[in-house]
Amino acid sequence: HTSSDANHPNEDYDVAELVSQIKSYTGNSRFLISLTDHNMINKSAYLKAIASNVNMIMGAELHIKLHDEVKSYHCHIFINKDITEDNIDAVNKILDKLYEDKLPKRDADTIPDIQDIINAFDGYDFMLLPHGSQRHGAFNYSIKKGETVDSAIYRSIYYNQFDGFTARSNSGLDATRNYFEKLGIGSFVNLITCSDNYNPKKYPEPHSDDAEEFMPTWMFAEPTFEGVRLSLSETSRLVYQHEKPERTSEYIHKVKLLNEHIDIDVNLTEGLNVVIGGSSSGKTLFVDSLYKAISHNFIGTKYSKYGVENLSVSNPSEMKPY
């Protein structure tokens, strides 16, 4: 957070101090941050950060109500937009309509529900990650004690709208996991940790004295919106610990084939790789031939006329695809 009162954004937020503290905390590792104030974007802080070449995602911490008879929960929204003055103004215009008061009481009638949020950001590429595990504002506490919920409806909401959840630490998640189990969701545990810090000089200390100790999230991906989204879909890319993790493992690096019929020149990355293409663009040819090349067995190939037997594969891992 940059502002203790989101209705009056802090124009003097010390971005340079925050960056200095993060670099010290991470041992000068590459990092990705989002300044998530309540229901608004602090334009001044974001533009100062971008001017300093900081890797950033535009984001805010929203109040969302499940239904009228319960308190709202907190939910981070991260938006895949270049951080420019015009883009920030456009997002703030939407947030101003949704939240005239940036710090509403959690039971205020004016707080939007999830469908209001989705409709308001129609046309944007965004992720929603509600609070989990924390003592306040967590979505698993946003129903009445003993309330019976329609599991099918709630499962649909979480599977279709939420990409993961946020907390200060990866500990104390039992209530969140138990809530998912009641809904029949067993694998929704993807977490991004957030500091809840308001004073950059004391980063990553939280606003509340009784909050859990902050546990940073280390991500094996590019420091971008897409890197976060990919990591949330593949939990092996996320590590929660204070020290920078060391991970060295080989993988399939490169696939190459060039002749009069075909030109393949593909660099692969560690972890999940996705082959995208239109109809008859060669997706199956590529994957099938890669498998056969690594297996050293082209018996039964349908693509001999393309010379796939000469496919060059750099595979120092010596792994064989399943």
Question: Where on the chain are the PLM-derived regions?
Answer:
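Charged catalytic cores and adjacent phosphate/nucleic-acid-binding surfaces used
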Residues: 1-24, 29, 42-57, 64-85, ...
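Ser/Thr-glycine-rich phosphate-binding loops at phosphate-binding pockets of nucleotides
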Residues: 1-2, 32-37, 284
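Active-site flanking residues adjacent to catalytic metal/cofactor-binding acidic residues
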Residues: 36, 60, 130-131, 195
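Phosphate-binding glycine-rich loops of NTP-binding sites
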Residues: 269-305
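Flexible phosphate/Mg2+-sensing switch loops adjacent to catalytic phosphate-binding sites
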Residues: 294-322
